[in-house]
Design a protein with these regions (language model features):
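Short secondary-structure boundary micro-motifs
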Residues: 1, 42-44, 96-99
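Generic preference for well-ordered secondary structure
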Residues: 2, 25-28, 87, 97
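Sec-dependent N-terminal signal peptides of Gram-positive bacterial secreted proteins and lipoproteins
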Residues: 2-21
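N-proximal, solvent-exposed amphipathic alpha-helical segments enriched in charged/polar residues
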Residues: 19-80
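Intrinsic-disorder-associated interaction segments
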Residues: 23, 34-37, 89, 123, ...
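Mature extracytoplasmic domains of secretory-pathway proteins
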Residues: 55-121
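Polar/charged, Gly/Pro-rich intrinsically disordered segments
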Residues: 112-155
Length: 155
């Protein structure tokens, strides 16, 4: 009887443990995020190209226009890899602009994004200028393939 109880307990532990595997990151879960959602913004930043150089970020949410400042260690190139698309090396300039496009597409109410790289001048983008240059930014986040486009179009 004890053996059956032990086997049943082990089996249930295994089944429950396997059903709690970490959820794969899904970009669609973050569409429509607001700049005030610190956790969601952090999750997005940790998936974008150059995330390995990310130091910290801050959000300006006290009054419009809402903005964010993202600080990176200095880098010259990084891998641009979104989902299962083939990774490609891109310059820091391309990575920052592509990241800004994706952030504007995912975060509804952010109007300005400022990137600070150690030892470099701040690089800033606003929603209006990138929309004029690239059109409807929300179309960029339709699927993983379209999310690679900002990094291909800029180089």
């Amino acid at each position: 009887m004890k053996n059956r109880s032990l086997i049943l307990t082990l089996f249930l532990t295994l089944v429950i443990g396997c059903s709690r595997l970490p959820k794969e990151f899904a970009w669609s879960d973050y569409k429509g995020t607001y700049v005030g959602n610190n956790s969601a913004v952090g999750a997005i930043l940790n998936e974008l190209p150059a995330h390995e150089y990310l130091e910290d970020f801050s959000l300006k949410t006290d009054q419009p226009p809402y903005e964010m400042t993202i600080r990176y260690k200095n880098f010259q190139q990084t891998k641009a890899e979104i989902g299962k698309e083939e990774a490609r090396m891109v310059s820091a300039k391309t990575a920052l602009k592509g990241n800004a496009i994706l952030l504007f597409a995912l975060i509804e109410n952010v109007e300005g994004i400022h990137f600070k790289l150690q030892g470099q001048e701040e690089v800033s983008f606003n929603r209006e200028e990138l929309t004029k240059e690239f059109g409807d930014l929300e179309s960029v986040v339709q699927d993983e393939s379209s999310m690679q486009q900002p990094f291909k179009a800029i180089e």
